[in-house]
Amino acid sequence: MIFNVLTIFPDMFPGPLGYSTVGNALRKGLWSLNVVDIRSFASDKHSTVDDKPYGGGPGMLMKADVLGRCIDSVLEAHPDTRLVYTSPKGKQFTQDMSRQIVHFGNITLLCGRFEGIDERVVDVYNFQEVSIGDYVISGGELAAMVVIDSCVRMVTGVIGNKDSLTRESFDCGLEYPQYTRPASWKGVSVPDVLLRGNHKETELWRCKMSRIITERRRPDLLKDCGGEEEGSSNE
């Protein structure tokens, strides 16, 4: 699995991606990171990558010609790469989308800055636009890290216990509550069903709690799974 990241701040990577499970997988060669400095494709002595938008307006836009040279260099080395632009205008990034992206094997993530990029870049190269949520952040680098982390977790060999992937939140509802020792803490006890050692009862409880939490907090996930919203209580 190869991720090419196009950014004007290459030193931000690998950043958090160099730690824990994803970082270990990077060191083991289960995935690779190719960071490309967009500024190196600027044509002037100041390495200018942005300019004022036509028609006026606040801020600056990343230039199409500079981005084009950068993208072309990646396509020359990786002609089959999937082009993804992290943008607030994009389709919401989901677990399902993460699975789809992983199948491409080679992903190029363009990290926008300033007020975004010249729209012609998206159109000419047919970028898939992806948003990590309905909020604004300073640039696309953090969004790219979120996408990479989510995708890398599904690469074979990265997560040791395959059950961890199938039981995670968003597969078909939110994850059930989990507890560890001590059995009682600050007057709050672990549910008895989890202490009895009956695996069937535990699974039933987990399914029930997953459903209840999803109905209360994210009923839209149940619709995506083909479920119906029903009133429930934790009894």
UniProtKB/Swiss-Prot annotation:
GO terms for biological process: tRNA N1-guanine methylation. GO terms for cellular component: cytosol. Its EC number is 2.1.1.228. It is found in: Cytoplasm. Disulfide bonds: none annotated. Signal peptide: none annotated. GO terms for molecular function: tRNA (guanine(37)-N1)-methyltransferase activity. InterPro entries: Alpha/beta_knot_MTases (IPR029028), tRNA_m1G_MeTrfase_C_sf (IPR023148), tRNA_m1G_MeTrfase_TrmD (IPR002649), tRNA_m1G_MTases_N (IPR029026), tRNA_MeTrfase_TRMD/TRM10 (IPR016009). S-adenosyl-L-methionine binds at G112, I132, G133, D134, Y135, V136, I137. It holds the Pfam family tRNA_m1G_MT. It comes from the Bacteria. Keywords: Cytoplasm, Methyltransferase, S-adenosyl-L-methionine, Transferase, tRNA processing. Its main location: cytoplasm. It is an enzyme of class 2 (transferase). It catalyses: guanosine(37) in tRNA + S-adenosyl-L-methionine = N(1)-methylguanosine(37) in tRNA + S-adenosyl-L-homocysteine + H(+). The keyword Translocase does not apply. Homodimer. NCBIfam families: PRK00026.1 (NF000648), trmD (TIGR00088). Belongs to the RNA methyltransferase TrmD family. Specifically methylates guanosine-37 in various tRNAs. This is tRNA (guanine-N(1)-)-methyltransferase. It comes from Anaplasma marginale (strain Florida).
